[in-house]
Each structure stands twice: as structure tokens, then as C-alpha cells.
């Protein structure tokens, strides 16, 4: 037994030594290698031949040109990592995303409008599934949807215009009216048409007002409809914010902040914070690289990586949506309290988001500049609390215990 033990111990030692030698050999590579820089299409921009004996000195090539609406952000390997390369390597350019879904005949469909429509139809589908469960008719919901949604979009537009008045109203009545309606040129030039400014608060409040009159006309329980609207809005917003992502708008400040005209973090550090500290998907981080003054110097004072507040808002709205689905299954929740929850949830969320955004809609009162969304959100929270108290006191027995088998 002792001999066998000694033999086994000897074999273990041999394998350990061989393993260590193997590891040492793998760390050293004296073979020549080539580092190749390519452009967006894979064409070679520059080749660097390295002898493998010493650290290869690499001079960064000229930055590749933009491709359509995509612009260059960085190389696939950061310059600080080039000295660690010891084998044939292809370094590719990383670009921002195109904000167009498709272009046909010179006219483009943008992700902004695409995600808004996706959100609207998802909200409609969820609402239709809910109507039968709480004693409403599908046709009533669909009829209301067909005329309330366009008016709500108009409300979102007008809300935005009111706080950006000088951007739209100048040069006479009709040019101003056309700009408000979406013709940015101020003429009936359909190539310039597009609703590039919408505010969700305007859409929400106009939708509630329209729903009030619609339910009065159809003699429907308004609080049941309000709950459907609230659930629909929060999921529609979760989708809609991705349109802001592709437009590189409604973002937060530069990652790491800045002192005066100097960013606190390098571009690589900004990228690493979003990618490896917050663990955001790389395609999101790449598209948060925004050039100085893309919308205005006040909004983007630096070229660098900005906080994706759209993503934070979208994810937190999805959480709120999930909670609302659970609340609908709780029999003691009264009809209308989902609207209360939405007002409080989104009001609090929007105050948090507005504290980071660089492009808020503002107004002045008594010489004090205020953020429109922050003031509105505070009022939403107060309204949500007041509505919940009113429902509990005045609508006893009108709760989800009367609903049929819950969905989700």
C-alpha cells in the first residue's frame, strides 16, 4: 500500500509540474501577429505587424466616417488594452444605432413612432381582455379607443408646445399652426412632417377627460374605465420610452458628472460604469454615447456616455405594471384604486427621473424656474392619495371581489 501511495503521489507531482509548465508556456507568445483595423463594412483601414518579441506600438488610425445616421463611438477594444494583445486581432468600429425602422421612397418610419404604436396596441389588447372580467363590453372599449387615442396624442403635442412655445410660434399664424401640427418647415411640405415633441402628461390628462365624457355618454362605470386606462398607460409608457432611446433623447447627465468644462471620468470609465457596474446590455451603453450639442449644448455639454434615464423609467414602469396586475387579483382593491396607484407610482418615478434629465420642460412663476414634469408629478401624487381616500369612503363594496376569473 505504501508503494502504491508513493507512486500515486509521484504521479500527482508530475502532473502538477507539467501543468505549471504548460501554464507558463501559454503566457508567452513570441510568434509574430497582425492587428487589423476595419471599417463598418469590414474593409481594412490599417494593419499593424507585430514581431511578438516586444510590446507592439499601435497608432490609432483615422476615425472611420459615419454611416447614414449611425456615428462612430469607439473601437471594439479600448486603446488602454492594445498593449495586452498578443495574437492576430481584428479591431472593429462601434457605432450608434439607426433610429429608423425602415425607409421607403425617401420616407422613414422611426422607432419613436413604432414603439408608441406598439405600446398603444399592447395596452388595448390588455384592456380588451380585462373588460369581460369586470363587466364591461369590448365594443365600448374599442369604440372609445378609436377616438380617445388620437385626441390624447394631440394633447401630448399641445402640452409639449405650451412649454416650448418659442420653438413653434413665430413667423405668422399659419406657419406657426403648421409647426404645431408637425410640419417643422412651417409649410405644407409632407417631407418635413413628424411629431417630434410629445409630453406624456398631456396625453394622460386628455385621455382621462375624454374617458369621463365617454363613460357618461355610454353610462359606464367611470372608475372601471379609469383602471383600464391606468394599466394601459403604464405599459404603453414602458414601450414608448424605447423610442427616446433610439432618438438619443430624454436622457440623464453625463456619467460621473463634470466640474466646469471637464468630465470627471474618461470615456472608458463611463462605459465601464454603465456596462459592468450597472450591468446594462452593451447595445444600450453604446447608444448612450452622444456627441456634444446633438440637441443643444445645454442638453449635451460633452461628448460622452449619458445616463439612460429612458431605461430606468421603462424598467420601473414594468415593475409598476406587474404590481397593478397583482392588485387586480386582490378582492379588497376598489375600482379606481389602480388609477390612484398609477398617479402615485408614476408621479414618484417621474420626480426621480426629472432630477437626472438635462432637457426638462420648464416654466417661470414669480421669477422662479420650475420643471413642468416635477410640479405635475407632485400634483399627481396628491391626487392619487385624495382619490384613494374618496373611493374608500364613497364607493364601499365596489371592488374586485365582483370580478370574474382573474387574468394573469
Regions found by a protein language model. Name each.
Residues 24, 49-51, 55-57:
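Sequence contexts marking disulfide-bonded cysteines in secreted/extracellular proteins
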Residues 31, 54-86:
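Surface-exposed interfaces of beta-sheet-rich extracellular modules
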Residues 37, 72-75, 93:
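Extracellular/surface recognition and adhesion modules
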Residues 5-8, 20-29, 96-408:
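A feature for loop-to-transmembrane-helix boundaries and adjacent hydrophobic helices
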Residues 7-15:
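Sec-dependent N-terminal signal peptides
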Residues 1-3:
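N-terminal secretory signal peptides that target proteins for export/translocation
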Residues 89-95:
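Append "Rare intracellular matches occur via the same short Y/T/C beta-strand/loop motifs
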Residues 35-52:
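Short, solvent-exposed loop/edge segments of extracellular or virion-exposed proteins
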Amino acid at each position: 500500500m505504501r508503494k502504491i501511495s508513493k507512486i500515486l503521489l509521484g504521479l500527482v507531482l508530475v502532473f502538477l509540474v507539467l501543468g505549471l509548465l504548460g501554464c507558463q508556456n501559454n503566457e508567452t507568445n513570441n510568434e509574430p501577429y497582425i492587428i487589423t483595423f476595419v471599417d463598418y463594412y469590414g474593409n481594412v483601414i490599417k494593419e499593424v505587424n507585430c514581431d511578438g518579441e516586444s510590446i507592439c506600438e499601435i497608432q490609432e488610425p483615422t476615425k472611420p466616417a459615419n454611416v447614414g445616421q449611425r456615428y462612430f463611438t469607439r473601437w471594439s477594444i479600448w486603446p488602454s488594452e492594445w498593449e495586452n494583445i498578443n495574437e492576430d486581432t481584428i479591431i472593429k468600429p462601434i457605432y450608434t444605432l439607426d433610429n429608423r425602422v425602415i425607409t421607403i421612397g425617401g420616407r422613414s418610419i422611426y422607432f419613436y413612432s413604432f414603439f408608441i404604436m406598439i405600446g398603444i396596441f399592447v395596452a388595448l389588447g390588455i384592456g380588451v381582455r380585462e373588460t369581460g372580467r369586470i363587466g364591461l363590453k369590448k365594443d365600448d372599449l374599442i369604440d372609445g379607443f378609436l377616438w380617445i387615442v388620437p385626441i390624447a396624442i394631440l394633447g401630448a403635442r399641445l402640452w409639449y408646445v405650451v412649454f416650448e412655445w418659442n420653438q413653434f410660434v413665430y413667423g405668422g399664424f399659419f406657419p406657426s399652426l403648421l409647426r404645431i401640427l408637425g410640419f417643422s418647415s412651417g409649410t405644407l411640405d409632407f417631407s418635413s412632417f413628424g411629431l417630434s415633441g410629445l409630453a406624456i402628461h398631456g396625453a394622460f390628462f386628455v385621455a382621462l377627460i375624454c374617458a369621463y365624457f365617454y363613460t357618461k355618454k355610454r353610462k359606464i362605470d367611470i372608475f372601471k374605465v379609469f383602471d383600464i386606462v391606468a394599466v394601459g398607460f403604464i405599459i404603453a409608457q414602458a414601450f414608448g420610452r424605447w423610442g427616446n432611446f433610439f432618438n438619443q433623447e430624454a436622457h440623464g447627465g453625463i456619467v460621473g458628472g463634470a466640474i466646469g468644462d471637464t468630465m470627471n471620468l474618461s470615456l472608458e470609465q463611463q462605459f465601464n460604469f454603465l456596462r459592468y457596474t450597472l450591468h446594462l446590455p452593451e447595445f444600450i451603453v453604446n447608444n448612450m454615447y452622444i456627441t456634444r450639442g446633438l440637441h443643444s449644448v445645454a442638453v449635451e455639454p460633452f461628448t460622452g456616455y449619458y445616463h439612460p434615464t429612458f431605461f430606468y423609467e421603462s424598467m420601473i414602469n414594468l415593475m409598476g405594471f406587474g404590481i397593478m396586475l397583482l392588485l387586480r387579483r386582490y378582492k379588497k382593491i376598489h375600482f379606481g384604486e389602480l388609477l390612484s396607484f398609477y398617479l402615485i407610482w408614476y408621479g414618484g418615478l417621474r420626480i426621480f427621473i426629472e432630477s437626472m434629465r438635462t432637457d426638462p420642460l420648464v416654466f417661470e412663476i414669480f421669477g422662479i424656474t420650475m420643471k413642468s414634469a416635477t410640479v405635475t408629478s407632485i400634483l399627481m401624487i396628491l391626487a392619487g392619495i385624495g382619490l384613494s381616500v374618496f373611493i374608500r369612503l364613497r364607493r364601499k363594496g365596489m371592488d374586485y371581489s365582483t370580478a370574474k376569473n382573474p387574468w394573469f
